[in-house]
Amino acid sequence: MRQRSQSPGSAYFYYPRLVCVIGARDDEKATANFAPVTWATPLSCEPPLFGACVSPSTRTHHLVLKTGEFTLSFLGMAEASLVDTLGRLSGSQVDKVKALELVLEPGEVATTPSLAAAYARAECILVDRHQCGDQTLLVGELQRVRVAAEAYDVQGVLRLDRISPLLYLGGNRYVTTDPTSESRPESRGDR
Amino acid sequence: MRQRSQSPGSAYFYYPRLVCVIGARDDEKATANFAPVTWATPLSCEPPLFGACVSPSTRTHHLVLKTGEFTLSFLGMAEASLVDTLGRLSGSQVDKVKALELVLEPGEVATTPSLAAAYARAECILVDRHQCGDQTLLVGELQRVRVAAEAYDVQGVLRLDRISPLLYLGGNRYVTTDPTSESRPESRGDR
């Protein structure tokens, strides 16, 4: 394979990545703010922790630190345009809920809403944060997960024949999975 | 959308996720160890940081802390079986390089090799670590990124018509992207 070597930062080599939308309660403006994040990952099984990178300059960062909680909303490919818009607007300047007529779901445990359009939603309590270069890794403990009843199979695996998860590819482009490519490999050495 | 509420941990709601294989030098055994990780994320642009969750009980954890460096290898869908096997074998018990006849690429900056089969590889120096529940988030500063010359377009975006990135879906299942689904949405409110 012909290769090229390059400095870090010049390629989106770590994409595609699943998009999740972080929700934060904005008491001051009597609304909530929603921002798409792809630099995010589960961090622990026990306790169940999930981390999301947020720039300290954002309204989301300010709100999560203030309220001590956040929600995660996972959306399908059909919501690419909405997600893109959420990423372009600033919660400091615009009430995104109002401007985009977002339909919200109230929290069951937390008091921060999530997006009704999501096929999976989680409520998190902020339990820790780590400064990582120019971002803050917000560490949330998962309190409750709500999923569309038809979205997952009995093993808890996403049904790609029913849900087309939204993945970010870099450069303002989005993509989803190919359900026909799904495979359960036979490990080398399996008999 | 009919919903069900559930305790965290009972659904793979945060999948699919891009697979990356962490490489660590094993001086003691004069080999290297490779383990697939999906709980991983970029953490910062400047400096360029990448974080990967590793259980403290693993050989990878031991080796990365000892050597202070690790590599990342991103593989295509065709390597699902290899990745699955790398995840099943323990580096404490087996020399995976030997057992699986892995072809390695030496590092350019670090001295830890990566997998030659990868379409993208990165070399990281361990700069920090955070205990997150039952995992350690290893924080690496990206030193060098090497990519297959044909894998990315001029904007640095992965060419899905050429590369089928390997995504983990949970439950021992893998999937890749659908290149025909790629879109660059027009933001709501764009004129």
What are the roles of these predicted feature ranges?
Chain A
Residues M1-R191:
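Basic, polyanion-binding surface patches
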